[in-house]
Protein backbone atom coordinates (compact mmCIF):
# COMPACT_ATOMS: atom_id res chain seq x y z
CA UNK A 1 0.00 0.00 0.00
CA UNK A 2 1.10 3.60 -0.56
CA UNK A 3 0.36 7.13 0.58
CA UNK A 4 -1.03 9.27 -2.26
CA UNK A 5 -1.00 13.05 -2.45
CA UNK A 6 -3.90 14.24 -4.63
CA UNK A 7 -3.42 17.82 -5.85
CA UNK A 8 -5.26 20.54 -7.76
CA UNK A 9 -3.55 23.87 -8.48
CA UNK A 10 -4.97 25.74 -11.50
CA UNK A 11 -8.43 26.25 -13.00
CA UNK A 12 -11.80 26.92 -11.41
CA UNK A 13 -15.15 25.28 -10.82
CA UNK A 14 -15.92 21.88 -9.36
CA UNK A 15 -14.75 19.73 -12.26
CA UNK A 16 -11.21 19.25 -10.96
CA UNK A 17 -12.29 18.09 -7.51
CA UNK A 18 -15.09 16.09 -9.14
CA UNK A 19 -12.55 14.12 -11.17
CA UNK A 20 -10.40 13.47 -8.09
CA UNK A 21 -13.26 12.45 -5.78
CA UNK A 22 -14.02 8.94 -7.11
CA UNK A 23 -10.31 8.24 -7.44
CA UNK A 24 -9.67 9.34 -3.85
CA UNK A 25 -12.49 7.13 -2.62
CA UNK A 26 -11.28 4.21 -4.72
CA UNK A 27 -7.68 4.51 -3.58
CA UNK A 28 -8.82 4.61 0.02
CA UNK A 29 -11.04 1.55 -0.51
CA UNK A 30 -8.03 -0.32 -1.88
CA UNK A 31 -6.07 0.40 1.28
CA UNK A 32 -3.99 3.37 0.19
CA UNK A 33 -3.56 6.52 2.25
CA UNK A 34 -4.95 9.70 0.67
CA UNK A 35 -4.39 13.38 1.41
CA UNK A 36 -5.94 16.06 -0.82
CA UNK A 37 -4.33 19.47 -1.44
CA UNK A 38 -6.89 21.65 -3.20
CA UNK A 39 -6.90 25.07 -4.82
CA UNK A 40 -10.30 25.90 -3.30
CA UNK A 41 -11.38 24.35 -0.02
CA UNK A 42 -14.53 26.44 0.36
CA UNK A 43 -16.28 25.80 -2.96
CA UNK A 44 -15.45 22.08 -2.82
CA UNK A 45 -16.54 21.53 0.78
CA UNK A 46 -20.08 20.43 -0.08
CA UNK A 47 -18.93 18.24 -2.96
CA UNK A 48 -16.36 16.42 -0.83
CA UNK A 49 -18.22 16.43 2.49
CA UNK A 50 -18.82 12.67 2.41
CA UNK A 51 -15.21 11.85 1.53
CA UNK A 52 -13.32 10.97 4.74
CA UNK A 53 -9.85 12.15 3.72
CA UNK A 54 -7.77 15.10 4.97
CA UNK A 55 -8.14 18.20 2.78
CA UNK A 56 -5.60 21.02 2.90
CA UNK A 57 -5.00 24.28 1.06
CA UNK A 58 -2.75 23.81 -1.96
CA UNK A 59 0.18 26.17 -2.60
CA UNK A 60 -1.16 28.59 -5.24
CA UNK A 61 -0.11 31.87 -6.85
CA UNK A 62 -2.04 34.79 -5.36
CA UNK A 63 -0.62 37.79 -7.22
CA UNK A 64 -1.30 39.72 -10.40
CA UNK A 65 1.64 39.25 -12.75
CA UNK A 66 2.80 42.27 -14.74
CA UNK A 67 4.19 41.70 -18.21
CA UNK A 68 2.15 38.68 -19.28
CA UNK A 69 0.39 39.11 -22.65
CA UNK A 70 -3.40 39.50 -22.58
CA UNK A 71 -5.19 37.40 -23.48
CA UNK A 72 -2.99 34.35 -23.06
CA UNK A 73 -2.77 32.19 -26.18
CA UNK A 74 -0.88 29.13 -24.89
CA UNK A 75 -0.35 26.99 -21.81
CA UNK A 76 3.08 28.58 -21.39
CA UNK A 77 1.56 32.06 -21.21
CA UNK A 78 -0.94 30.85 -18.61
CA UNK A 79 1.96 29.59 -16.50
CA UNK A 80 3.76 32.93 -16.85
CA UNK A 81 0.81 34.47 -15.04
CA UNK A 82 0.97 31.91 -12.22
CA UNK A 83 4.51 32.26 -10.94
CA UNK A 84 6.59 30.93 -13.83
CA UNK A 85 7.92 34.31 -14.98
CA UNK A 86 11.23 33.86 -13.13
CA UNK A 87 12.89 31.04 -11.15
CA UNK A 88 12.77 33.10 -7.95
CA UNK A 89 8.96 33.46 -8.21
CA UNK A 90 8.43 29.79 -8.99
CA UNK A 91 10.72 28.39 -6.31
CA UNK A 92 8.52 29.29 -3.28
CA UNK A 93 5.56 27.50 -4.88
CA UNK A 94 7.71 24.43 -5.49
CA UNK A 95 8.86 24.61 -1.87
CA UNK A 96 5.22 24.58 -0.83
CA UNK A 97 4.51 21.42 -2.81
CA UNK A 98 7.66 19.78 -1.47
CA UNK A 99 6.40 20.53 2.03
CA UNK A 100 3.03 19.04 1.06
CA UNK A 101 4.80 15.85 -0.02
CA UNK A 102 6.62 15.65 3.30
CA UNK A 103 3.54 16.38 5.40
CA UNK A 104 1.53 13.80 3.46
CA UNK A 105 4.40 11.28 3.65
CA UNK A 106 3.58 10.73 0.00
CA UNK A 107 4.90 7.73 -1.89
CA UNK A 108 3.01 8.70 -5.05
CA UNK A 109 1.13 11.68 -6.46
CA UNK A 110 -2.04 12.15 -8.51
CA UNK A 111 -2.82 15.65 -9.78
CA UNK A 112 -5.47 17.44 -11.80
CA UNK A 113 -4.03 20.55 -13.51
CA UNK A 114 -1.19 21.02 -11.00
CA UNK A 115 2.03 21.58 -12.96
CA UNK A 116 3.98 22.99 -10.00
CA UNK A 117 3.20 19.88 -7.99
CA UNK A 118 4.69 17.88 -10.86
CA UNK A 119 7.87 19.98 -10.70
CA UNK A 120 8.10 19.13 -6.99
CA UNK A 121 7.53 15.44 -7.72
CA UNK A 122 10.46 15.44 -10.16
CA UNK A 123 12.69 16.95 -7.48
CA UNK A 124 11.52 14.58 -4.76
CA UNK A 125 11.65 11.49 -6.96
CA UNK A 126 7.99 10.72 -6.28
CA UNK A 127 6.16 8.90 -9.12
CA UNK A 128 3.33 11.11 -10.34
CA UNK A 129 0.19 10.64 -12.42
CA UNK A 130 -1.71 13.49 -14.07
CA UNK A 131 -5.42 13.11 -14.80
CA UNK A 132 -7.64 15.37 -16.86
CA UNK A 133 -8.70 16.48 -20.29
CA UNK A 134 -6.56 17.48 -23.22
CA UNK A 135 -6.33 21.18 -22.42
CA UNK A 136 -3.67 20.55 -19.76
CA UNK A 137 -2.42 17.23 -21.14
CA UNK A 138 -1.17 18.69 -24.42
CA UNK A 139 0.31 16.94 -27.46
CA UNK A 140 3.99 15.98 -27.61
CA UNK A 141 5.04 19.06 -29.59
CA UNK A 142 7.60 21.84 -29.22
CA UNK A 143 6.29 24.37 -28.70
CA UNK A 144 2.92 23.25 -27.37
CA UNK A 145 0.35 24.53 -29.91
CA UNK A 146 -1.45 27.77 -29.18
CA UNK A 147 -5.01 27.19 -28.05
CA UNK A 148 -6.31 30.62 -29.10
CA UNK A 149 -5.76 29.72 -32.72
CA UNK A 150 -8.68 31.73 -34.08
CA UNK A 151 -6.81 35.03 -33.70
CA UNK A 152 -3.56 36.25 -35.30
CA UNK A 153 -0.49 35.39 -33.20
CA UNK A 154 2.85 37.09 -33.81
CA UNK A 155 5.55 34.75 -35.15
CA UNK A 156 7.71 33.38 -32.36
CA UNK A 157 5.39 34.47 -29.55
CA UNK A 158 4.39 30.97 -28.45
CA UNK A 159 7.96 29.66 -28.64
CA UNK A 160 9.36 32.59 -26.64
CA UNK A 161 6.84 32.11 -23.83
CA UNK A 162 7.61 28.41 -23.69
CA UNK A 163 11.36 29.04 -23.55
CA UNK A 164 10.87 31.49 -20.68
CA UNK A 165 8.73 29.04 -18.70
CA UNK A 166 11.17 26.22 -19.33
CA UNK A 167 14.05 28.44 -18.16
CA UNK A 168 12.21 29.13 -14.89
CA UNK A 169 11.45 25.44 -14.31
CA UNK A 170 14.99 24.36 -15.09
CA UNK A 171 16.40 27.10 -12.88
CA UNK A 172 14.46 25.63 -9.95
CA UNK A 173 15.41 22.06 -10.88
CA UNK A 174 19.06 23.11 -11.06
CA UNK A 175 18.81 24.61 -7.57
CA UNK A 176 17.78 21.19 -6.26
CA UNK A 177 20.32 19.27 -8.31
CA UNK A 178 17.65 17.71 -10.51
CA UNK A 179 18.06 16.95 -14.21
CA UNK A 180 16.57 19.61 -16.52
CA UNK A 181 13.22 19.21 -18.25
CA UNK A 182 13.88 18.85 -22.01
CA UNK A 183 10.46 20.07 -23.20
CA UNK A 184 7.47 21.69 -21.52
CA UNK A 185 4.93 19.14 -22.77
CA UNK A 186 6.78 16.48 -20.77
CA UNK A 187 5.87 18.20 -17.49
CA UNK A 188 2.08 18.05 -17.71
CA UNK A 189 1.64 14.28 -17.92
CA UNK A 190 4.05 13.39 -15.14
CA UNK A 191 5.15 9.76 -15.16
CA UNK A 192 1.64 8.50 -15.91
CA UNK A 193 -0.57 10.70 -18.12
CA UNK A 194 -4.25 9.80 -17.77
CA UNK A 195 -5.93 11.59 -20.68
CA UNK A 196 -9.64 11.52 -19.91
CA UNK A 197 -11.09 12.48 -23.26
CA UNK A 198 -11.89 11.22 -26.76
CA UNK A 199 -10.55 12.49 -30.08
CA UNK A 200 -13.91 14.10 -30.96
CA UNK A 201 -13.76 16.36 -27.89
CA UNK A 202 -10.01 16.84 -27.54
CA UNK A 203 -8.81 20.43 -27.27
CA UNK A 204 -5.72 20.10 -29.50
CA UNK A 205 -4.90 18.66 -32.90
CA UNK A 206 -2.47 15.77 -32.39
CA UNK A 207 -0.03 14.26 -34.84
CA UNK A 208 -1.29 11.04 -36.46
CA UNK A 209 1.76 9.15 -35.18
CA UNK A 210 1.39 10.30 -31.56
CA UNK A 211 0.49 7.37 -29.33
CA UNK A 212 -2.50 8.43 -27.23
CA UNK A 213 -4.33 6.32 -24.68
CA UNK A 214 -7.86 7.73 -24.82
CA UNK A 215 -9.57 6.92 -21.51
CA UNK A 216 -12.85 8.79 -22.00
CA UNK A 217 -14.14 11.72 -19.92
CA UNK A 218 -13.94 11.40 -16.15
CA UNK A 219 -16.69 13.04 -14.08
CA UNK A 220 -19.09 12.48 -11.22
CA UNK A 221 -21.95 10.60 -12.90
CA UNK A 222 -24.53 10.91 -10.18
CA UNK A 223 -25.68 13.14 -7.38
CA UNK A 224 -27.83 16.22 -7.26
CA UNK A 225 -31.57 16.61 -7.09
CA UNK A 226 -33.90 14.75 -9.48
CA UNK A 227 -35.05 16.85 -12.44
CA UNK A 228 -38.26 18.81 -11.93
CA UNK A 229 -39.62 19.96 -15.28
CA UNK A 230 -42.07 22.86 -15.44
CA UNK A 231 -45.57 21.97 -16.59
CA UNK A 232 -45.56 24.73 -19.18
CA UNK A 233 -48.01 27.54 -19.79
CA UNK A 234 -51.43 26.42 -18.56
CA UNK A 235 -53.07 28.84 -21.00
CA UNK A 236 -51.68 26.87 -23.94
CA UNK A 237 -52.96 23.38 -24.76
CA UNK A 238 -53.51 21.17 -21.76
CA UNK A 239 -50.45 22.53 -19.95
CA UNK A 240 -49.01 19.04 -19.57
CA UNK A 241 -46.02 17.67 -21.49
CA UNK A 242 -46.19 20.90 -23.47
CA UNK A 243 -43.02 21.60 -25.44
CA UNK A 244 -39.55 20.09 -25.62
CA UNK A 245 -37.64 19.59 -22.39
CA UNK A 246 -34.43 21.60 -22.19
CA UNK A 247 -31.87 21.36 -19.41
CA UNK A 248 -29.87 24.58 -19.11
CA UNK A 249 -26.76 24.94 -16.95
CA UNK A 250 -25.95 28.62 -17.21
CA UNK A 251 -24.00 31.24 -15.30
CA UNK A 252 -24.87 34.88 -14.85
CA UNK A 253 -21.39 35.86 -16.02
CA UNK A 254 -22.26 35.06 -19.64
CA UNK A 255 -23.69 38.18 -21.29
CA UNK A 256 -26.32 36.22 -23.23
CA UNK A 257 -27.67 33.97 -20.48
CA UNK A 258 -30.92 35.93 -20.15
CA UNK A 259 -31.37 36.30 -23.91
CA UNK A 260 -30.97 32.55 -24.30
CA UNK A 261 -33.60 31.86 -21.64
CA UNK A 262 -36.01 34.32 -23.30
CA UNK A 263 -35.49 32.52 -26.61
CA UNK A 264 -36.17 29.13 -25.02
CA UNK A 265 -39.45 30.42 -23.62
CA UNK A 266 -40.38 31.96 -26.98
CA UNK A 267 -39.67 28.60 -28.65
CA UNK A 268 -42.19 26.91 -26.38
CA UNK A 269 -39.63 24.92 -24.41
CA UNK A 270 -39.99 23.68 -20.86
CA UNK A 271 -36.73 24.64 -19.22
CA UNK A 272 -35.08 23.19 -16.14
CA UNK A 273 -32.34 25.70 -15.37
CA UNK A 274 -29.51 25.40 -12.89
CA UNK A 275 -28.07 28.88 -12.50
CA UNK A 276 -25.71 28.92 -9.47
CA UNK A 277 -26.20 32.62 -8.84
CA UNK A 278 -29.95 32.09 -8.44
CA UNK A 279 -29.36 29.35 -5.88
CA UNK A 280 -27.23 31.92 -4.01
CA UNK A 281 -30.06 34.45 -3.89
CA UNK A 282 -29.85 36.37 -7.17
CA UNK A 283 -33.20 37.27 -8.72
CA UNK A 284 -33.97 34.91 -11.64
CA UNK A 285 -33.14 36.68 -14.92
CA UNK A 286 -36.32 35.46 -16.66
CA UNK A 287 -39.59 34.64 -14.92
CA UNK A 288 -41.91 32.29 -16.77
CA UNK A 289 -44.08 29.25 -16.02
CA UNK A 290 -41.93 27.54 -18.63
CA UNK A 291 -38.76 27.83 -16.50
CA UNK A 292 -38.06 26.01 -13.26
CA UNK A 293 -34.89 27.12 -11.47
CA UNK A 294 -33.26 24.26 -9.58
CA UNK A 295 -32.41 25.05 -5.97
CA UNK A 296 -29.20 22.97 -6.13
CA UNK A 297 -27.20 20.99 -8.72
CA UNK A 298 -29.27 18.55 -10.77
CA UNK A 299 -28.56 14.86 -11.37
CA UNK A 300 -27.41 15.09 -14.98
CA UNK A 301 -27.85 11.41 -15.69
CA UNK A 302 -31.55 11.62 -14.84
CA UNK A 303 -32.00 15.00 -16.55
CA UNK A 304 -30.44 13.95 -19.85
CA UNK A 305 -32.44 10.72 -19.89
CA UNK A 306 -35.52 12.94 -20.30
CA UNK A 307 -34.17 16.03 -22.10
CA UNK A 308 -34.54 16.94 -25.76
CA UNK A 309 -31.77 19.55 -25.67
CA UNK A 310 -28.98 20.73 -23.37
CA UNK A 311 -27.69 24.29 -23.02
CA UNK A 312 -24.42 24.92 -21.21
CA UNK A 313 -21.05 26.67 -21.32
CA UNK A 314 -19.21 23.63 -22.76
CA UNK A 315 -17.71 22.21 -19.59
CA UNK A 316 -16.51 18.69 -20.36
CA UNK A 317 -18.56 16.88 -17.70
CA UNK A 318 -21.88 18.34 -18.86
CA UNK A 319 -21.07 17.98 -22.56
CA UNK A 320 -19.93 14.37 -22.21
CA UNK A 321 -22.99 13.25 -20.26
CA UNK A 322 -25.34 14.93 -22.75
CA UNK A 323 -23.62 13.30 -25.72
CA UNK A 324 -23.54 9.88 -24.07
CA UNK A 325 -27.32 10.24 -23.67
CA UNK A 326 -27.68 11.26 -27.33
CA UNK A 327 -28.81 14.80 -26.46
CA UNK A 328 -27.75 17.66 -28.78
CA UNK A 329 -26.37 20.86 -27.29
CA UNK A 330 -26.44 24.63 -27.59
CA UNK A 331 -23.07 25.80 -26.29
CA UNK A 332 -22.23 29.23 -24.87
CA UNK A 333 -18.51 29.08 -23.98
CA UNK A 334 -17.15 31.64 -21.51
CA UNK A 335 -13.40 31.14 -21.96
CA UNK A 336 -10.87 29.64 -24.34
CA UNK A 337 -10.89 26.11 -22.93
CA UNK A 338 -14.67 25.94 -23.30
CA UNK A 339 -14.56 27.51 -26.77
CA UNK A 340 -12.23 24.76 -27.98
CA UNK A 341 -14.55 22.12 -26.55
CA UNK A 342 -17.59 23.79 -28.15
CA UNK A 343 -15.85 24.01 -31.51
CA UNK A 344 -14.93 20.33 -31.43
CA UNK A 345 -18.44 19.20 -30.49
CA UNK A 346 -19.97 21.39 -33.20
CA UNK A 347 -17.73 19.64 -35.72
CA UNK A 348 -19.40 16.35 -34.82
CA UNK A 349 -22.73 17.87 -35.89
CA UNK A 350 -24.25 17.32 -32.43
CA UNK A 351 -24.09 20.93 -31.24
CA UNK A 352 -24.12 24.59 -32.14
CA UNK A 353 -21.35 26.79 -30.78
CA UNK A 354 -23.06 30.13 -30.25
CA UNK A 355 -19.68 31.87 -30.00
CA UNK A 356 -19.10 31.09 -33.68
CA UNK A 357 -22.27 32.90 -34.75
CA UNK A 358 -22.55 36.63 -35.54
CA UNK A 359 -23.68 38.93 -32.75
CA UNK A 360 -26.23 39.76 -31.58
CA UNK A 361 -26.84 36.07 -31.12
CA UNK A 362 -29.82 34.75 -33.04
CA UNK A 363 -30.92 32.16 -30.51
CA UNK A 364 -34.29 31.65 -32.17
CA UNK A 365 -32.72 30.34 -35.38
CA UNK A 366 -30.24 28.20 -33.46
CA UNK A 367 -33.00 26.62 -31.38
CA UNK A 368 -35.09 26.00 -34.48
CA UNK A 369 -32.17 24.12 -36.04
CA UNK A 370 -31.49 22.07 -32.91
CA UNK A 371 -35.11 21.25 -32.08
CA UNK A 372 -36.78 20.79 -35.44
CA UNK A 373 -34.09 19.56 -37.83
CA UNK A 374 -33.07 15.90 -37.47
CA UNK A 375 -29.35 16.30 -38.28
CA UNK A 376 -28.23 17.40 -34.81
CA UNK A 377 -30.24 14.70 -33.06
CA UNK A 378 -28.88 12.09 -35.47
CA UNK A 379 -25.29 13.24 -34.83
CA UNK A 380 -25.80 13.13 -31.06
CA UNK A 381 -27.33 9.66 -31.31
CA UNK A 382 -24.39 8.52 -33.46
CA UNK A 383 -21.93 9.85 -30.87
CA UNK A 384 -23.75 7.95 -28.14
CA UNK A 385 -23.69 4.79 -30.24
CA UNK A 386 -19.94 5.07 -30.90
CA UNK A 387 -19.27 5.21 -27.17
CA UNK A 388 -22.05 2.92 -25.98
CA UNK A 389 -19.50 0.66 -24.32
CA UNK A 390 -18.20 3.43 -22.08
CA UNK A 391 -19.20 3.15 -18.43
CA UNK A 392 -17.96 5.47 -15.73
CA UNK A 393 -17.57 2.74 -13.11
CA UNK A 394 -15.43 0.66 -15.48
CA UNK A 395 -13.30 3.67 -16.30
CA UNK A 396 -12.72 4.49 -12.63
CA UNK A 397 -11.68 0.88 -11.97
CA UNK A 398 -9.23 1.08 -14.89
CA UNK A 399 -7.75 4.34 -13.57
CA UNK A 400 -7.39 2.82 -10.11
CA UNK A 401 -5.61 -0.21 -11.55
CA UNK A 402 -3.14 2.14 -13.22
CA UNK A 403 -2.63 4.04 -9.97
CA UNK A 404 -2.04 0.74 -8.17
CA UNK A 405 0.75 0.19 -10.68
CA UNK A 406 2.18 3.61 -9.81
CA UNK A 407 2.10 2.63 -6.12
CA UNK A 408 3.95 -0.61 -6.87
CA UNK A 409 6.52 1.41 -8.76
CA UNK A 410 6.97 3.70 -5.76
CA UNK A 411 7.35 0.75 -3.39
CA UNK A 412 9.85 -0.94 -5.70
CA UNK A 413 11.90 2.25 -5.84
CA UNK A 414 12.00 2.34 -2.05
CA UNK A 415 10.61 5.87 -1.75
CA UNK A 416 11.43 7.37 1.64
CA UNK A 417 8.98 10.27 2.23
CA UNK A 418 10.97 11.69 5.14
CA UNK A 419 13.86 12.40 2.77
CA UNK A 420 11.91 14.48 0.25
CA UNK A 421 13.91 17.52 -0.81
CA UNK A 422 13.98 20.47 1.55
CA UNK A 423 14.45 24.14 0.69
Please place each PLM-identified region on the residue numbering.
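A short, glycine/small-residue-rich beta-strand->loop->alpha-helix junction that serves as a flexible
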Residues: 8-21, 253-254
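Donor-nucleotide binding loops and adjacent catalytic segments primarily
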Residues: 24, 202-309
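Conserved nucleotide-sugar donor-binding subdomain of glycosyltransferases
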Residues: 71-110, 114-116, 157-184
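Conserved nucleotide-sugar donor-interacting segment of glycosyltransferase catalytic cores
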Residues: 91-155
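A donor-sugar binding/catalytic signature common to diverse glycosyltransferases
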Residues: 108-113, 138, 297-342
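Active-site-proximal region of nucleotide-activated glycan assembly enzymes
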Residues: 127-203, 209-210
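C-terminal amphipathic helix plus adjacent low-complexity
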Residues: 185-187, 365-423
